[in-house]
Amino acid sequence: MSSYFVNSFSGRYPNGSDYQLLNYGTNGAVSGSFRDPGTMHSGSFGYNYNGMDLTVNRTNTGGHFGAVREDARGFAPDARYRQTPNCSLSSPDPVPPSCATASREALELKSPSPPSDRSTTSGGNALNKSNGAHFTEIEDATAASETEEGAHSSGGSGTAPRAQQQHQDQNATSSTPTSNDCQTPQIFPWMRKLHISHDMTGPDGKRARTAYTRYQTLELEKEFHFNRYLTRRRRIEIAHALCLSERQIKIWFQNRRMKWKKDNKLKSMSLVTGGSAFHN
């Protein structure tokens, strides 16, 4: 209910203490018996009554309803509390027919509950307090039906967003090739790596001969000039710098050392032969 109904109630019924009000408690109030609102937490009353006299007559209710505390603070409606009345009312004092119909219309206009809850509430206004357990069962059944309807509606509405999402994904995938074609970077010759494939198998199954470029050969000759043997760390550095594998660097240095030994042997032999001829 809204504050509009509360204000209209105070205007139509000057003597608010002579009429009984609805007991708006937490969900735990649906237990067949009614709690005393005076002992409940002030946050259970979701509206500020602006100093209205909401004192309920204890003599007519037989002790089931207590006096509503006037210092109840006004809190915003919380989703945890059901705003629909969770209990039935005992038969109040005779009310003029015009006032009863007006209050019923205000309830139907301002109540956010479904028609089943409204019918239950209107029926509870005319029944005795002994039917509280019966209305509790109706409330539970109504809540269960509401959850089932919400599940069906969410399941049915979820198919449409899925279809839209799939359609958007298809559009995105179809538009990506065109954007990739337009944004293909230009690759210059100096950006290409040499000897990327290090497979050592040729067309006949034998190890393929490595063709070194002039730049690679020059760098390897410089390194061999300073040191004929390489450490593993230095071999890894040269392999990364020349875009070669460690195995290729190791084989090149082995071959280069063999060639160097052969050249030195030939030089020594030529010196020996030349010296012997000079002495003769």
UniProtKB/Swiss-Prot annotation:
| Name of the protein in question | Homeobox protein Hox-B5b
SMART domains per the UniProt record, alphabetical: HOX
Per the entry, what this protein does is:
Sequence-specific transcription factor which is part of a developmental regulatory system that provides cells with specific positional identities on the anterior-posterior axis.
Give a GO molecular function annotation for the protein.
RNA polymerase II cis-regulatory region sequence-specific DNA binding
Enumerate the residue ranges of region (Disordered).
Answer: 79-185
Gene Ontology CC entries for this record = nucleus
Q: What is its main location?
A: nucleus
Q: Could you say which protein family the record assigns here?
A: Belongs to the Antp homeobox family.
Which organism's genome codes for this protein? Takifugu rubripes (Japanese pufferfish)
